[in-house]
A protein has these predicted regions:
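Repeated loop/turn-to-beta-strand initiation elements of outer-membrane beta-barrel proteins
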Residues: 69-74, 105-108, 160-163, 205-208, ...
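Transmembrane beta-strands of outer-membrane beta-barrel pores
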Residues: 37-43, 77-83, 103-105, 114-116, ...
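Membrane-embedded beta-strand positions of outer-membrane beta-barrel proteins
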Residues: 33-37, 75, 110, 153, ...
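Detector for outer-membrane/organellar transmembrane beta-barrel domains
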Residues: 215, 249-360
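Outer membrane beta-barrel
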Residues: 64-174, 201-204, 391-393
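Transmembrane beta-strand segments of Gram-negative outer membrane beta-barrel proteins
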Residues: 23-47, 55, 69-75, 355-357
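Outer-membrane beta-barrel "beta-signal"
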Residues: 340-344, 388-390, 402-416
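Residues that define the transmembrane beta-barrel architecture of outer-membrane proteins
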Residues: 51-57, 90-95, 145-149, 191-195, ...
């Protein structure tokens, strides 16, 4: 971590002459906050606990005032009632709170911020920094993202090519808790220092990036502790991950081809764990096309190759039951996981009505997710959204394990 910290400080020192020029400030531009407040009805929460008929309310507010020509604040916060599966009643979180200095060719952002990497459609193997809250009752997956405390420095080599360095404190996903076994011990969440680098080319017919991340995995990794053979425990720990990744997007007329690939070396961070590292390779390849003026169709294939998968076939008794349970906790169902994503969307009635239907097919486990969405804008402020998350498949499969999270919803929201 000393090397990464030295790198960030060196880049910051290089930026000092440019940042000094920013002191010729103009008057601040205190723009008004913007966001959305919503009232929703859901047939289930997202905590895997069979809860039904939930009324939720929440607001997502952003404010990005410019202090002068080179400095801007970024604030984004969420507050809600019954809108988070792991919390009953009121909940809230500051998702972003940062200050940004922009003095070309440097851009420096410090504070809590959402950092999203990857050009594929919603499945992004290289996206390792910002965690998600998978229990939030929101129709858009992007609203699940949470910020991390970080310093991000970007240097524009030329108008199309840039290099970005990030030094951050680790934070982790919020996941459903109701399905966790009672004999589980979870380690305390560490606050380790992490770093990442990305070389990015954008703004041309062929966009691409190469990135590297060294930090903690955002998901807990579970193992079985046989210290007491008569009462084995599940233990959840956080793993150190080094990940090398790349992505690309090629646009030609109405067509866009996208892809991502990442190779991760993941090792246990707990002293009592086995020392062997495991390796995971993930890839996505697909594309989308615009047609009939307002419609879009997207298709992708994806694959995950896992070195350390434990196949329960051939095991019996307690060992088989524990292995099946462990694989469900870690969402490990095959050494080679393959799947397909589909998405069709359209805008009609002068963009007042927007609909989308998306599906994810788990080809190994024969499970699937279907997620239609419909949004109607009465005017610039009032909006109605309805949708469905339907999961099905065997219990020992990715979407079969999420059946209790199947839900239908209707949301009335006010945009300001």
């Amino acid at each position: 971590m000393k090397t990464s910290t030295t790198l960030a400080l060196s880049l910051l020192a290089m930026a000092q002459p440019s940042l000094a020029q920013a002191q010729d400030a103009t008057a601040p531009t205190l723009s008004a906050p913007f966001g959305e407040c919503a009232l929703g009805q859901w047939t289930s929460n997202r905590n895997l606990d069979d809860s039904a008929e939930i009324t939720s309310a929440g607001c997502l507010v952003s404010w990005k005032p410019k202090l002068n020509a080179n400095m801007q604040l970024g604030l984004n916060a969420r507050a809600g009632w019954q809108d988070q599966g792991v919390t009953s009643g009121a909940s809230g979180r500051v998702r972003e709170a940062y200050v940004e200095f922009d003095a070309e060719p440097f851009s420096l952002r410090a504070g809590r911020q959402i950092i999203a990497w990857g050009r594929a459609d919603r499945i992004n193997p290289i996206d390792s920094l910002s965690p998600r809250d998978f229990t939030l009752l929101v129709p858009d997956d992007e609203q699940q993202r949470n910020g991390i405390d970080a310093v991000r420095l970007r240097y524009a080599i030329n108008p199309a090519l840039s290099i970005t360095a990030v030094v951050a404190k680790s934070d982790f996903n919020v996941t459903p808790q109701a399905s966790l076994p009672p004999n589980l011990v979870l380690a305390e969440s560490p606050r380790d220092t992490e770093w990442a680098l990305k070389l990015d080319r954008s703004g041309s017919g062929v966009d691409w990036s190469v990135s590297y991340f060294d930090g903690l995995s955002r998901a807990v990794r579970y193992r079985v502790d046989f210290t007491n053979p008569r009462a084995p425990l599940f233990r959840g720990d956080f793993e150190r991950m080094q990940k090398l990744g790349a992505d690309f997007a090629i646009a030609q007329g109405a067509w866009t081809i996208r892809g991502e690939v990442a190779h991760a070396r993941i090792s246990p961070s707990c002293t009592a764990c086995a020392s062997d590292a495991r390796r995971v390779t993930s890839a996505v390849l697909g594309g989308d096309v615009d047609f009939a003026e307002t419609m879009n169709f997207n298709v992708q294939v994806f694959a995950n190759l896992k070195e350390d998968f434990t196949d329960p076939a051939g095991l019996t008794g307690v060992r088989e039951a524990l292995t099946l349970g462990l694989n469900r906790l870690n969402t490990d169902y095959a050494a080679r996981e393959t799947g397909l994503t589909l998405r069709l969307s359209d805008r009609i009635l002068n963009d007042k009505l927007r609909w989308e239907i998306s599906a994810v097919l788990d080809l190994n486990g024969n499970s699937r997710a279907v997620r239609p969405r419909l949004t109607y804008a009465f005017n610039d402020h009032l909006r109605l959204t309805a949708g469905l998350d339907h999961f099905e498949g065997p219990s020992q499969s990715y979407f079969g394990a999420l059946i209790k999270n199947s839900t239908a919803f209707a949301i009335v929201s006010w945009v300001f």
